[in-house]
Each structure stands twice: as C-alpha cells, then as structure tokens.
Amino acid sequence: ISSLIEKEAKSDQDKRLVSSVILNRLDNNLKLQVDATTIFSITKGKYKLKRDLNYQDLKNKDEYNTYFIRGLPPLPICYVNRKTIEILLENYKSEYLFYFFNEQVQKHIFSKTYKQHKKLLEEYRKNE
C-alpha cells in the first residue's frame, strides 16, 4: 500500500488522504484503480510513460494493473520513503473513495461518491 501512496501523492496531506482512499476502497471491496499501478504495468516498472493513460491502458490484463485486478498488486511498485510508511500507519480516516490529480492547481481533488467524482472530473476537463 505504501508504494502506491508513494507514487500517487507528493505532499504529506495528500499522502494521508490517498492512503485513506486506498484503505476505504479495500474495505469496500472496490478495485483500487490507481494510475501508478497501470503505468508500472505498461512500462514494466520504468515509470516513464511519454503520454497520458488511455482507456485501453486501463484494460491491460496484468497482475499489477489495479484497474484490472481487485486488491493489491503482488509486490510493491517502488521503494518507499520512511515518512510515507509512517503516514500509512497513522491510519488517517476519511470518507473519500475517489480522487484525481488536478494539473491546473497541482493538487488532488477528493470525493466521497462516484457521482460527485464524475461531476468534478467533468468540470476539470472543461477547463483543460
């Protein structure tokens, strides 16, 4: 879990919220749908994807692609900073189940419901 957080978030606060989303999704038996795992799967661990992810990427049948599998990948996807592990062990609580990274404001946007997530994503894409 900590390797997913490490790749998904940069700030400590975002790491707390991303960790809570991952734990909430695991608790609710939802697919994690973490982009970093899909990038890891496509690039075989190189992480240098010179384009945006697309729908076909998300359907990639690989044990590391959390859009395809349910639960965690078989192994970590990167080395983890000690601080990230400490943040995960805080077991930060939220009601969030979804998030995306807003490039314009350089931060993650979190939501509790799929309906809210979809609406926020649509607004973001209109302003791109």
Regions found by a protein language model. Name each.
Residues 1-128:
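Bacterial extracytoplasmic/cell-wall-associated proteins, especially those involved in peptidoglycan
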